[in-house]
Structures are given as C-alpha cells and as structure tokens.
C-alpha cells in the first residue's frame, strides 16, 4: 500500500512537472504542444510581437504588450524595445514610449502622445500557466486613462462562429464587427513634441484629411463584447482553448475591425490611475496537450513536374518523431490507385523547429496523376506531364494579374468589372515633407510648385499591390523583367485587348498584339511620360491622405477624376543616383524589345537611359548600378564606350560577382570569341570568380532542405527566392558546367508549394491544386485573390515558427507587389520549361 501511494505521488509530480512551462534553449516557453514567446518578434504593426501563444501548430494570440488605444491599427504608436533578457526561467523585456525615431517621420510616420514611460514586461511560468507582469516607471496621465492598457490580439481567421466565455457571460465571435459604438476623446489632442530633426517632418493634418482617418481612429470604437475578470477563448476545442485571468483590473473583449477593417479581436485590461508596480498582472493558461505531435507535412510542387526534370519531395515532421517508414508514390488512374514506388526517405536533419526528410523520384517519368503518402499524410494530387507548364501556370500573370493591376484603365472581364478607369486626374506636385509609405519630397527637386498640376502623367503603370501607388522601381523593374522574359524565350501570347487612348482593358479579348510586349509598353509609358513632364525621374505617384491609402474597393473610387482638387494624387521626385541608374538599366533593357513594336517609345526609353548614365558620377557607391546600366546600354546599342567601361570594372565585377554576375554573364559570353588579351583576361577572371561564388551558393543552399539559399525573416521569403532564381538562370544559361539548372527548379518548386510550414499552398494565386486564394490585393476586403498574383509567402514567427495564414490583411505573408512579385515567378516557369539555352541578345548592326 505504502509503495502504491509513493508511486502515485511520484507520477503526479512528474505529470505536474510535464504540464508546466519550461524556458527552452530557443528563448521561449514550451509545454507539450503549446509555446509562449515573449518579444522574440518585434513587428507590432504587422501583428507580430509581444507575448505570443502558439497552440498545436497554430498561432492563436499575439502582440501582448502595452498599447495606447483599445484597438490600435498599423499607424498607431508602438513602443520601442530597449532590452530583452531570457534567463533564470523568465523573460524580461524593457520597452518605452515614445519611439522618437518614428514620431511624425519615417517610412510610415506615427504621432505619439505626451507620455514618456519606460516599462518592463516579465513573463514566467506559474502553475500550469504563464504569469505576465507589467511594471511602469511613470503612471498613466489622466488623458490616457481608459486608453493605455495591456492588449492581447486574437487571430480572427480561426475564430469566426466560435465561442468565448467571460465570467458568466458567453458569446460567439462574429463574422463582421457589430455595433454598438463607443465615442471618446482622441489621443490626438495631446500630441507630443518628440521630433528629433532627423529627416523631414510629416504633416498629420494633411494625412488625416477629412472625416475618418486611420491615423486618428481611437475616437469611435466598438463597445466591448464583454467585461469581466476571467476570459476563455474556444472553450469547445481543447486544441485552441486559452484562458486569461486578470489579477489587477477588468478584462474587456473588443473587436478591432470596427475602426480598422484589418483589425483583430483584442482582449485588454486598462492601467489604473497611479499604477506603476504590478500595473498589469495576467495569468494566461492554455490547454496543454502533452501527447500532441506535429503531423507530417508533405511538400511538393502543387503544379507537378516535367518528366525529365528533377523531382524531390520534402517531408516536414515533428523533431521528436522517428521516421515512420517508407513513403509511397501513388499513381491515380480511372480504375483507382496504384503504388508505383516505395521510397525510404533520407533524414535531412533539423531546420527551424522541425526535422526534415527528403526523397527523390526523378526517375519516375511516366505521365499521369500522382500523390505521395507518408504515414497518415497525403500530398495534393500533382501531374507529371510534358505540358505541365503550358496552361494556367505562368500565363495567369499576363492573362489576369498585370491587366487587373493596370492604372488609368477600365479593366473588364466579360460580366466582371475589375475596376473602372482610375486616376485620370493625376497628378499634383507633392508638398515638401515626409509623407507615407516611404515617400519624402525634398525641396528644390522640381520645376513645379507644390500643388501645381503636372500634366501628361495619367498614362501607363500598374498599381503596386493594394496600395494603388506607382513606384518608379516597381514600374521600370516590372517592365524590365518582362522585357528579359520576352528576349530570352520569345513567348507568344495574345488574350487581352489594351487601348491606352480609350483607357480600356478587355481580358480574354485578343487584339493582335503580344501581351507581354504590351505590358512592357505599359510600364515604360508611366516612367517615360513622367520623366518628360518633370525633366527628371519621378519617385512615384501616391495618394495624399491616409484614408485614400488604406482604401478598400474600386481603384476609381480613390479620386473623382476631376483634375486640380484636393483628392488628386501627388507626384514625388528624389535625388537618388543608385535608383536613377537602376532605372536607366531597366529602360535600356525595355528599349530592346520595344523595337519594332513601339519604335517611338523604344527610342524614348533609350534616350533617357543614355542621359541618366551620362549624368552619373564616378562615385564608388554607385559603381555597381552604373555597371548594370553600361551592360544594358551595350547590349542595346553595341557602342564600344560602354564595353570599355565594363572591362575597366573587372575588379569590381569579380569581387562582387554575387551582385554583378548575373547581368554581366551575357557580356562575358559575347567576349568568349574575342581574341584580344583584355577580353581573354576578363573572361578568365570572371569565370574564376563565378566558380568561387558557386562554392558560396552551395554552402548557403545546404543550410535548408529546399536546395536554395533561404534565411527566413519576418517577411515571407518567396519574392527573394524568385529573384534569386531569376538571376541564377542567367548564370546557368551562360555557364551550365558551373551552375546546374536544378537550382532553377528548386526555386520554382519553393514558390509552387515545396516550402516550410503546415500550409503548403502555391504562392501563385490560382495556380496548382492548392494555392493562395486569399491575398492582400485590391480585392482583399472580399477575402479574394487575383489569378497570377504571387504572395510574399511563408513568414517566420521568430525564432522558429513558419506561418502562412489564410488571411487577406497580413502584407508580410499574402501581399502582391509589382517589380518582380509575379514577373520573376513567370520568368522562372518559362526558364524551367525551356529545354534549350536562350539566345544571347543580338547587338545592333553598325
């Protein structure tokens, strides 16, 4: 009996210990399938940061921190993180308000109220939960009472229609925010004086505009759904059940979507008058499942494979799991399934928080439908076929995405109007000062006065993602990538009518003109016409108020179409020699493919590129950009002066070949037939530098199971990997003996589904068996997508949790952009499907 009692006590003690949180070597708390992170991330405006809870492979809540509004948006003040210390079983983070580096200045300026405070957030285990304690060095001023408090945001996408409890109250998370409303005084009547004089100052009144403003959105909010001391989210589901108990002031459950359409559900408690020590104390108790293990995720291309291309599957598993045995490759036919191959996966090792297995089935070449099975997990069904890339893979970029993004046009698709003719009232000269989204107008950089109409700029261009602005690097960059795609692969496609004179686009109505070249033309038009109007490059064109910037809906609704009034967009200029030269290179590339298609525009592109190059200095800081321009100008004109400059840069090229190699490779190949000593020395040195670069690439690619250089950060890495694959193609095309083509396939497969995380969707919307069909584009308010748009992709919840949510308002995961976001992907597909090397550009005849 005594032995039984002792055994029971020991088992109880072991169970209790197993169910308490432990601080692990990665700097966060873990118990079973639940992780609690504290300030490993700091991106609060993107709903990443503060105290974060991950339960059984899903991020449930985040951004646990002091905020100055009940339901802040991305333009409300965020603290500055000063220090983080994870030791002795607890995590203590020191933060402060204000962050003067962001007050009325910076990429997206914020307005901080008059409260200077340093505070600590201490997170530590208590019982089966986590205790969060906030200590302030300065009490909350009267005007912030009822405003300043500790917020915890709950991801809404998992919660619609699901239950919650608050003390004796209960409710269901609604699909849309519901009244009643609360009206209160705004913090904006107490703006601080924190501008430190670095950079230019923003004008909050201008950004506010009239009526509702995202910059001033704390005066009308949703009334809380409930008030109490103990809150439980998802009491019906042990895998997501989370209880929060406040040991200080009341908890209130708010709906952040009432004053910001992209808001989350917010649980908060306000800081009491005079409180400093223990100003906030919360006990957070997630339901812990000790037995939960991450189920295997099979990662393959959601589109499929050419018969002859490499085929490799990556299987993501719980790091505590042992391999489950063989992987089965199943072929699906009219009479059912047949196992065509049993493969024992190779243990690749650990990356992020998972153990990875890999298997190769490149020798399977018979066309058909296939699926991979491993344990209880199954991949999507995919094809092996010689025509796997020939329809609905790269084509939606040209067929849908780029036409839909076109500015100054009415875009129709049969019954559907994607958007009406927009921004025909472009544009007024921007006011001097710091604006939004990185726009910053400096004095003395325009021959137009502030607010003066700049004529002739209401043509061409694409809206950049959901922001509706035209950035020079996006416009020229997109045209350039498309130009190189056409130059390399000479692809013929005509499924769209484009009429700039009538401002009309008709999707699925051919007009007898190549659609890729029409899109090159569209990008060149906005850059060239703006240059001609301003006498210099524009920085871009963007709306004048924050409400316009955050607009959800038809692009034509942003302005009234009548020129010379306050709703017109602004055009910006800048003094940026590197960007000017990059644009020159891009225009020179576009000029080549526009010859014979639009000769006048081709010559205008070339003239501007030559002018920008000739105006540039010999400053070493712009040397790489100038080299790129010289390469494109030589390929376009054949003029020896450009080649002479390139050859003189041999040292720069070889020492920074990771940057210069891809665009210089075309020149080096042309020089291989030259017999002069200078050319031969250049070719030899360049080849040696490339061989050394390949060694570096191999080391970087070996760091992950995906076969490409990939070091994840807050933003999804899809665009970076696409760009890498795009640049790598020029190396494998010119030097296949050094750079095997397999890396091009690896980069493409990453985009098409072979990437980390439980969501193995294709980043290319509408492409493949499973793809990102909820995205941050112009129709994000409808939880929809644009075919051919490519999202940013799987992000990292630091330090080690890959995440791709089905949610339209996380730009770091699901945004579309111009300047490569989709065109790099399109180029990769064309490169993958091209069996022969491309033809080098032909130099113009003398």
Where is each model-derived feature located?
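Beta-strand-rich N-terminal accessory domains
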Residues: 19-88, 184-221
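Sec-dependent N-terminal signal peptides
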Residues: 4-14
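Acidic, glycine-anchored loop motifs typical of Ca2+
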Residues: 502-519
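Aromatic (Trp/Tyr) and acidic
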Residues: 202-235, 303, 311-375, 388, ...
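Acidic (Asp/Glu-rich), glycine- and aromatic
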Residues: 131-181, 376-388
